[in-house]
Amino acid sequence: FMAPALVRRENLVGTGWFGGPNNPTEEDVYKTQDDIYLSGTAEVSMMGYHRDEIMNTDEFPKLYAAFSPCYRREAGSHGKDTKGIFRVHEFFKVEQVILCRADHQESVKWHEELTKNSEEIMQMLEIPYRVVLNCGGDLGLGQVKKYDIEGWLPSENKYRETHSASYFHDFQTRRLNIKYRDGDNLKFAHSLNNTAMATPRILCMFLENHQNPDSSINIPKALQKFFEKEKIG
């Protein structure tokens, strides 16, 4: 999907974007004079795409990869990451979004699959990384479980977040009224999401981990067929 960046407030509220101690406030999101918001992730528009919809069980799982420009006002806030390209106001991101049956084990399975997808990307880019299980105090509004994937940033001598994988059970779908038929019953679907790739943030780890003393950049094996060379510069 090419997801729109402009979203309605009700879709931000429905996905849990506002509210909760670890979530952005309305002041953190760009807003137009027409009361339309610039979204910080394609998750918002993809969930809004199914708002007020009733689906059939055999339509699940819904597996999406959605590309969109993203906008966040918190970039450089409180003196944090004010320089460089790690935290910026506008960036591009591919987001993985899943809707599945209202079953806990189903959510757990797809959550692990989403995380595995992102791990494979980091492995193909040959970027050292770790997977962090977030504690309850770090969860956003409605999140049941969340993994962060953090890539190694040599200039800071520490790992920094590149991906965030969460599942919500029916928190988002109840707010957005996304249901499916299960026999004679209507049930709220379960929702999940995870970053696939966000630029330019991933470039920080990519360049720092592959740069040589002569400033040339080693090309990971997975990308060499596109560059037709092993290094650039």
Mark where each language-model region is.
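TRNA-recognition modules of translation machinery and tRNA-sensing kinases, especially anticodon-binding
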Residues: 1-233
